[in-house]
Regions:
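A short, N-terminal "cap"/entry segment at the start of jelly-roll beta-barrel domains
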Residues: 1-28, 109-110
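Conserved short histidine dyad/triad with adjacent acidic residue
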Residues: 15, 30-46
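Short histidine-centered beta-strand/loop micro-motifs
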Residues: 20-22, 40-46, 87-89, 108-109
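A short hydrophobic beta-strand segment most commonly corresponding to one strand
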Residues: 30, 77, 92-109
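Short, conserved beta-strand element in jelly-roll/cupin
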Residues: 34-36, 46-61
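Short beta-strand His + acidic residue motifs that chelate non-heme Fe in jelly-roll/DSBH
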Residues: 43, 61-62, 78, 84-90
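A generic "binding-loop/recognition-motif" signal
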Residues: 47, 66, 82-83, 92, ...
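Short acidic-glycine-tyrosine-enriched beta hairpin
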Residues: 66-81
Length: 110
């Protein structure tokens, strides 16, 4: 068992980053995104699936050219290779847990 405190994780951009291979020798990486309104990553893709659990706030997602609005309680499953981006919308932060099915974070920015 590994115990990692959130405050000990690197904070990059708008996310605490738990990279499985570095923090617990495990096959997944998890990011806690805490984005202010208007923030979010531009178009990118990963060579593995990603599952996003929306905890608070609202956002707009674009996946392979289709746009979706979502909020607390929604789950997005983004398949390997799908081009996607999202940004927080509204007046409150967007908080989500992003599970990357890979021990290492791999992202191609487009």
């Amino acid at each position: 068992m590994h115990h990692v405190r959130q405050e000990n994780l690197p904070f990059v951009g708008s996310s605490h980053e738990f990279v499985g291979a570095e923090h617990a020798d495990t096959g997944v990486s998890v990011f806690l995104f805490h984005g202010k309104p208007g923030s979010g990553p531009g178009p990118h893709r990963h060579p593995y699936d990603e599952i996003q659990f929306i905890l608070e706030g609202r956002g707009m997602w674009t996946v392979n050219g289709q746009t979706f609005e979502g909020g607390a309680g929604d789950i997005f499953v983004i398949k390997a290779g799908e081009i996607h981006s999202f940004k927080a919308v509204g007046d409150s932060p967007l908080i989500q847990v992003d599970v990357h099915l890979s021990p290492r974070f791999i992202q191609e920015n487009l």
